[in-house]
Amino acid sequence: LSAGYYDAYYNKANKVREVLKQDFQKVFDSGVDVIITPTTPTTAFGFGEKSDPLAMYMADIFTVTANLTHMPAISIPSGYDNNGMPFGIQMTAQQGNEDILFSISQDFEKNA
């Protein structure tokens, strides 16, 4: 980051990160063990099908929150669309609860 923009962007981003972490923590403190979401907003696109960098970035948008908040998350396959393209689900837990993610995802894959 340019020196003139450091405070404007980096520090603001860290404040947003803290708000997100607090929001997630409130959910976990209410008794939720795992948050389950789609991994991506759509099924996978074919190799070479997308060349727009923004569209490719947006395909990962649901994974950003776990990365920003440093919460452990795992993505596992959960099925295929009518064209045979895969899609998955992402599970997010609070820090230190990776064992819950591994256990639930293992059970899901065995029974899917």
Question: What is each PLM-predicted segment?
Answer:
Residues 23-24, 62:
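Residues within well-ordered alpha-helices
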Residues 45-55:
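Glycine/threonine-rich flexible loop motifs
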Residues 1, 40-43:
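Short glycine-rich anion-binding loops that position phosphate/pyrophosphate groups of nucleotides
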